[in-house]
Amino acid sequence: MATANIAIKQNSSTNIAFIERMPSPSLHRILYNLFSKFSYSLSNSCHFNLKCLNFVMNRMFHMSMEDLSQCTILIVDDSPDNIAFMSQGLAQYYRIKAARSGKVALEILAQYPIDLVLLDIVMPEMSGYEVINQIKHNPHTEHIPVIFLTGKSNPEDEQLGFELGAVDYVFKPVSIPLLKSRVHTHLQNKRSKDILLNQNDYLETEVLRRSGELDRMQDAVVFALASLAETRDPETGNHLLRTQHYVKVLAQRLATTDKYRDVLSPTVIDTYFKAAPLHDIGKVGIPDNILLKPGKLTPDEFTTMRNHALLGKLALEKAEKLSGACTALINVAKEIAMGHHEKWDGSGYPLGLKGDDIPLSARLMALADVYDALICRRVYKEPMSHEEAKAIILQGRGSHFDPMVIDAFLIEEQNFIDIAQKFADEESAMVPIQLGQQASG
């Protein structure tokens, strides 16, 4: 049996991986090596990023604790004497802003970055409770700590203040040493929370960045694996690109129907798109004298050729088990590899599945694969026009193909034509034809 090892060369600008053939180990070992290298790269990258993150966060923490003098305190009290007294006690440690009413306080909060609010409860026009309620319901100020200033000690009032979001109470007449201690403590707490928020923002950004990199790496690996099988047959050209786009437009159309609206989410459709190139990965295990035979296959040869569906699924299963990389992508790839030659009426292979027992991903791939084979030149046939291919596909309605997939194809046939032309093989192995144009000959 002729098999092939691979060397992968990735174009950094396109993330498309190309295959070079070499003498070979087993297919599942190739898959395992690729998935293992992928996982190793991820592990090293994450370890490096966590070390960098710890260094950055430690630096941020120490710098932040040393820099509380840059914090701004807003004192809100209707008494000018109280404002002057507290300002004098805090001004040498922090920046101070003051307001004699709740309305002015809210205006200051809307214009300036404030780190902590000292808020009198009993004020004319607008009480401290009303002010804190607005502060805590504004996403731009809800994180600012508020310390209530009050001339009376009442447990019910204190409970209400804490329920509204206050972090502390300071009783009048105010003790400056006590006030400084409370302010310093809550500024430290706020700065720690700010650091955590910054850390979370950093992590979210880093996760998104790394996820994007891993998605692109995964796409490159998938296309590399698929290309492994395609390099066995020099006539397949851009078959992988065309069929994955056919599958995508079919899935997007079915997603508008009642039956599949809740099944075909954008994420699922993207997984179908990425897994589609692996549909014929099992062909790497088919001998060249059968795979590339220009004439009709004998019954025994056809039996061997049919094995590629099972070989593909088994190779993916083996790689999945060895690498521990169980993902939606691999699961869909197994469905497509195993099921894209099944037929709606149960006459397909390898399991003879019927109707909805055939995975939807495989039903979409079945039509995409047949359509592309019909419109492309092969060693045993000339390319058909779109209309000729369409006629054959329509003949398979309810027998070869899912009727709903046929309906989607009819609606999207101009997109099929556009995809075929966009990803046409370099040697013009397809017949260019516009929708409705009649085939010649």
From Swiss-Prot:
Limits of the Response regulatory domain: 72-187
Residues bearing the modification 4-aspartylphosphate: D120
Entry's Gene Ontology BP terms: phosphorelay signal transduction system
The keyword Ribosomal protein appears for this protein: no
UniProt domain HD-GYP: residue ranges: 214-425
InterPro entries assigned: CheY-like_superfamily, Cyclic_di-GMP/3'3'-cGAMP_PDE, HD/PDEase_dom, HD_GYP_dom, Sig_transdc_resp-reg_receiver
One example GO MF annotation: phosphoric diester hydrolase activity
Keywords: c-di-GMP, Hydrolase, Phosphoprotein
UniProt cross-references to SUPFAM superfamilies, sorted A to Z: CheY-like, HD-domain/PDEase-like
UniProt catalytic activity: 3',3'-c-di-GMP + 2 H2O = 2 GMP + 2 H(+)
Induction: Transcripts are more abundant in biofilm cells than in planktonic cells.
Gene3D superfamilies found in the cross-reference section: 3.40.50.2300, Hypothetical protein af1432
EC number(s) recorded for this UniProt protein: 3.1.4.-
SMART domains xref list: HDc, REC
Keyword Membrane: no
Enzyme class: hydrolase
Function: Probable phosphodiesterase (PDE) that catalyzes the hydrolysis of cyclic diguanylate (c-di-GMP). Increases motility and decreases biofilm formation in vivo.
Annotated protein name in UniProt: Probable cyclic di-GMP phosphodiesterase VC_1348
